[in-house]
């Protein structure tokens, strides 16, 4: 588990270099292995359709949910949201914008799974041959036994040669759908990235500086938090065995932790690179930084919430 966590931390730390290419390659490779080892079409009129759809869609759903679980923004949004101390979790619009961004990022792996599965064709062939609607369309103008033998096509057990030849048509349909899905995803991703960059309130070089600042801030925060926690633990253990009272340590309160753990919002009136930066520059100690007039969620700045003392959630 520790090795697995180290790999995840490495991916989070160097996500700009690794990008989503690693996720795509791992998903594609996993689908190919899964298809070759676990998938065996039953070649039954009753089971082909549900069996093919389950193998095509259920792993995609699992990957989508896993994308939510591994997103630091998900837990920033949800942690403490239902407690009485945080009855209000921000405006519905702001929350929906963040959820949309999280969903878009989480959709990469499942879309890759579906696209690679369609290019392979096995899942689609199995599901299509078990559909009565597909059977009517595919068997149009063929002999009467076509519909009955169609479920046997994925296993190469159809007696009529013209029926068995439908396997080539099904594979072609599946691969065309796969390439269409890939093209649509790339076009949407390109448009979304271009629009978010176009609407960015900060320049290209400032974004680079921003990411450098966040990396340094989180490294120093983790180092300081580890040092403070170690000293506090040593003091408490020492006092426990000696029966003495511990000396006072200035540890941030629950409210202060909640302030810097909230989702980042951009405000043109103040140039803050993180919620911690915003908190230490507040005008009054009792002033809340969670919601201020003019605060907005900027898609291109979503990376701010992806950083943390340990961005990989506890598994």
UniProtKB/Swiss-Prot annotation:
It is a multi-pass membrane protein. Disulfide bonds join 41-126, 43-155, 139-146. Pfam families: Ca_hom_mod. InterPro entries: CALHM. GO terms for molecular function: monoatomic cation channel activity; voltage-gated channel activity. Residues 1-21, 69-102, 193-315 are cytoplasmic. It comes from Homo sapiens (Human). The keyword Cell membrane applies. GO terms for biological process: ATP export; regulation of natural killer cell cytokine production. Keywords: Cell membrane, Disulfide bond, Ion channel, Ion transport, Membrane, Transmembrane, Transmembrane helix, Transport. This is Calcium homeostasis modulator protein 6. The chain crosses the membrane at residues 22-37, 47-68, 103-127, 170-192.
């Amino acid at each position: 588990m520790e090795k697995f966590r180290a790999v995840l931390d490495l991916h989070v730390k160097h996500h700009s270099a690794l990008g989503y290419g690693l996720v795509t390659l791992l998903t594609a490779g996993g689908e190919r292995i899964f298809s070759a080892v676990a998938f065996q079409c039953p070649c039954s009129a009753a089971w082909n359709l549900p069996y093919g759809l389950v193998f095509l869609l259920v792993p995609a759903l699992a990957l989508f949910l896993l994308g939510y679980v591994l997103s630091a923004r998900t837990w920033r949004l949800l942690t403490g949201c239902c407690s009485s101390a945080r009855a209000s979790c921000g405006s519905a619009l702001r929350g929906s914008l963040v959820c949309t961004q999280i969903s878009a990022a989480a959709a990469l792996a499942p879309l890759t799974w579906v696209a690679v599965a369609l290019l392979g064709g096995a899942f689609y062939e199995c599901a299509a041959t078990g559909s009565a609607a597909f059977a009517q369309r595919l068997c149009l103008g063929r002999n009467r036994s076509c519909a009955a033998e169609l479920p046997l096509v994925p296993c190469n057990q159809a007696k009529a040669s013209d029926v068995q030849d439908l396997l080539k048509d099904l594979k072609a349909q599946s691969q065309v759908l796969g390439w269409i899905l890939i093209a649509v995803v790339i076009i949407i991703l390109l448009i979304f990235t271009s629009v978010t960059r176009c609407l960015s309130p900060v320049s290209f070089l400032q974004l680079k500086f921003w990411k450098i600042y966040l990396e340094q801030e989180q490294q120093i925060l983790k180092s300081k938090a580890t040092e403070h926690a170690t000293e506090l633990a040593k003091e408490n253990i020492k006092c426990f065995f000696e029966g003495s009272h511990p000396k006072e340590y200035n540890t941030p309160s629950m409210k202060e932790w909640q302030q810097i753990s909230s989702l980042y919002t951009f405000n043109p009136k103040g140039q803050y690179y993180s919620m911690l930066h915003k908190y230490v520059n507040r005008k009054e100690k009792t002033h809340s930084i969670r919601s201020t007039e003019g605060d907005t969620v900027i898609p291109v700045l979503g990376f701010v919430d992806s950083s943390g003392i340990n961005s990989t959630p506890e598994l």
